């Protein structure tokens, strides 16, 4: 009984009528033919088969791509294991998103032109020479029909996105790309987009996979539209540039009973299992690329090294698995093996270090590690902290001329032993991902809490000193088993003082002479525009207040409405040091100090700094040319020293119950006055120009 004709996708392969084909290997057999060219031409029927389709898909799965190219299960299995090399538009099958967090939309243009087939009734009887050709080849089929036309795929990719915006961007991309056919006005390009759509299309790239030869491939949306409009012309006036799209093949067994044949096919379910495994390994690659593109892996070589090692192992395993399937598949089709051998290959993967579970778990761990490190780095934002990749560059920074002190936030556990990578490298010993009693440092709540606490402390140290030329703030990774997760190194004059920095104790406040004693207690303050009086103007990022004519500020409950005063935004407890620079104009009283948040804001009665129980003030009296201190409307006067009162340092020891003021000059401090008081809530630094 004659076997059924086989129908397969051409996939860019150079099929011709009468060509021999081995379906066990899915391999074209060029060279000897059963019939000469003249006989083939004489027995060929050519019929018109005009069609044109435009299709949009947001799926990037193997199944979706195979469907667009009309690839059936058996041929798909051969493609997945690398038995066949595709060309033309079918190269689209090999292309996948680089990142998991990336939007992709694909536009397919497909046209068919004609169908050619051999009239086999006159060719079915073979002579001995023709049968000899079959015997000498490995062919199982002969090409008897071909549908011609062309496929073109425009693949539009967004840039790498946050996971939360992938679906939204993809939907917007799909809506714009669906408009492409409407931009073709009788063979001319007329692109009409809103400003929002233009902004969107400017952010995604285009790749082209087609059967027609272009002068240059489109890389942008606009270029893609122009190419789309030109595609019908590229087929040629007589459609001479059309290529095989679909191929019909007759089993040679129908012509010669001794011809080789396919004994068995792999079941559709098992092909789907192969597809799932290949796709899973592809997803691993995308997640790896997401990790490699993260700033953490770019800044920390230890992370990048482990990712690259994992990537190499994954690539090697994927290649080995495909080669094993490519060897097994033809044997099953020839009847030398059954499906169980292919099933075993896939089952062995699940028992190996390359199982879905273990690869996913390794990536989960690495993504967690990157996120933990990234969260600490984020906490250093706005501090001019420099990330240095290695010990050599760290030494350069701490030994740089003019650098007296350097604090370095050190990630200490990035080079921890990775049992999963070891298992991959020693596949013969199938180790577990991690021993059950070993908790990765980045999953320890205790370690994470400590790291974030240190990162916050580092930020609070670095921000107020970010413009200091004598102090450097750095971040790096150095293995240190004593401090799991992270610690802070302190260098003084290029020498490591401690690998676990904490603020040094402060000497008695009246005895402090050197600013370095208070350096690590410096804080970064900003004046609060909501509280500024109408006769003050704020500038320099709310770091400076200047007396001025009355301003048209909106009224609000927090604003001082009579006296030129302003509070800072930051409420302080703990120990803090800051400095205030005053103009040398002694025609105006000036006061600096702190106040509780509930200090009065409206009217004249006891609102000034120091005139109430909610505030403490130290300043200069312009009329008497003397210094004064005040709290709860009790005032003490002091002579104004010859050095003046240009820059005042303020040290708040909230738990110790002191508020001290110093005249500052270069690195020298001169103690002026100390309030001894026990604060009951946070205090806000204040300036008073009244």
Residue ranges and their predicted role:
Residues 1-333:
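Membrane-permeabilization and membrane-interfacing ectodomains
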Residues 5, 11, 24-25, 352, ...:
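Alpha-helical interaction segments
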Residues 16-30, 489-492, 499-507, 542:
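Polybasic, low-complexity association/targeting segments
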Residues 79-82, 268-271, 275-278, 294-297, ...:
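Intrinsic disorder
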Residues 277-523:
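Long, compositionally biased eukaryotic scaffolding/regulatory segments
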Residues 503-690:
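Beta-rich ligand-recognition domains in immune and ubiquitin systems
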């Amino acid at each position: 009984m004659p076997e059924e004709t086989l129908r397969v996708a051409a996939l860019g392969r150079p099929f011709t009528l009468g060509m021999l084909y081995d379906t066990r290997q899915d391999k074209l057999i060029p060279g000897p033919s059963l019939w000469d060219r003249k006989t083939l031409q004489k027995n060929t029927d050519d019929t018109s088969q005009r069609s044109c389709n435009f299709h949009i898909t947001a799926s990037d799965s193997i199944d979706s791509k195979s469907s667009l190219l009309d690839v059936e299960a058996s041929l798909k299995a051969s493609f997945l294991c690398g038995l066949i090399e595709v060309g033309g538009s079918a190269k689209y099958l090999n292309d996948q998103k680089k990142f998991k967090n990336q939007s992709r939309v694909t536009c397919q243009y497909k046209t068919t032109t004609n169908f050619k087939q051999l009239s086999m009734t006159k060719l079915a009887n073979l002579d001995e020479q023709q049968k000899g050709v079959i015997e000498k080849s490995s062919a199982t089929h002969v090409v008897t029909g071909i549908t011609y036309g062309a496929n073109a795929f425009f693949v539009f990719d967004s840039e790498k996105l946050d996971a939360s915006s992938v679906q939204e961007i993809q939907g917007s991309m799909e809506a714009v790309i669906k408009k492409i056919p409407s931009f073709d006005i009788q063979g001319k390009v007329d692109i009409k987009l809103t400003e929002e759509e233009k902004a969107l299309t400017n952010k995604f790239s285009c790749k082209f996979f087609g059967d027609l030869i272009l002068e240059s491939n489109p890389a942008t949306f606009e270029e893609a539209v122009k190419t789309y409009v030109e595609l019908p012309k590229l087929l040629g006036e007589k459609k001479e540039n059309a290529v095989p799209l679909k191929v019909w093949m007759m089993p040679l067994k129908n012509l010669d009973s001794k011809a080789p044949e396919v004994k068995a096919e792999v079941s559709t379910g098992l092909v789907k299992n192969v597809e799932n495994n290949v796709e899973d390994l592809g997803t691993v690659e995308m997640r790896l690329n997401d990790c490699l593109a993260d700033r953490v892996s770019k800044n920390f070589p230890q992370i990048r090294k482990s990712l690259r090692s994992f990537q190499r192992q994954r690539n090697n395993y994927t290649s080995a698995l495909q080669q094993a399937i490519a060897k097994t598949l033809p044997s099953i089709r020839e009847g030398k093996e059954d499906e169980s051998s292919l099933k075993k290959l896939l089952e062995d993967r699940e028992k190996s270090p390359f199982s879905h579970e273990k690869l996913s778990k390794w990536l989960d761990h690495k993504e967690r590690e990157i996120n933990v490190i990234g969260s600490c780095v984020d906490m250093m934002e706005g501090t001019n902290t420099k990330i240095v990749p290695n010990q050599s560059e760290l030494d350069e920074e701490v030994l740089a001329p003019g650098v007296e002190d350097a604090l370095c936030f050190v990630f200490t556990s990035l080079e921890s032993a990775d049992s999963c990578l070891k298992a991959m490298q020693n596949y013969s010993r199938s180790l577990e991902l991690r021993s059950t009693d070993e908790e990765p440092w980045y999953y320890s709540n205790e370690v994470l809490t400590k790291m974030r606490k240190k990162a916050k402390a580092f930020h609070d140290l670095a921000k107020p000193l970010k413009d200091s030329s004598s102090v450097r703030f750095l971040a790096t990774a150095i293995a240190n088993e004593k401090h799991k997760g992270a610690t802070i190194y302190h260098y003084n004059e290029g020498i490591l003082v401690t690998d676990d920095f904490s603020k040094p104790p402060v000497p008695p406040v009246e005895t402090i002479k050197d600013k370095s004693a208070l350096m690590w207690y410096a804080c970064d303050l900003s004046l609060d525009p909501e509280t500024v009086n109408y006769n003050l103007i704020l500038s320099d990022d709310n770091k400076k207040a200047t007396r001025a004519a009355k301003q048209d500020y909106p009224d609000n409950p927090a604003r001082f409405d009579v006296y030129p005063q302003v509070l800072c935004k930051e409420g302080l407890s703990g120990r803090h040091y800051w400095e205030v620079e005053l103009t040398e104009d002694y025609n105006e009283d000036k006061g600096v100090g702190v106040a509780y948040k509930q200090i009065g804001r409206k009217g004249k009665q006891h609102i000034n700094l120091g005139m109430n129980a909610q505030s403490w003030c130290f300043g200069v009296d312009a009329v008497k040319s003397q210094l004064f201190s005040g709290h709860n409307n009790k005032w003490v006067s002091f002579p104004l020293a010859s050095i003046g009162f240009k820059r005042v340092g303020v040290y708040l020891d909230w738990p110790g119950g002191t508020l001290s003021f110093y005249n500052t000059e270069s690195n020298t401090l001169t103690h002026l006055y100390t309030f001894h008081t026990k604060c009951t809530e946070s205090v806000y630094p204040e300036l008073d120009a009244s």
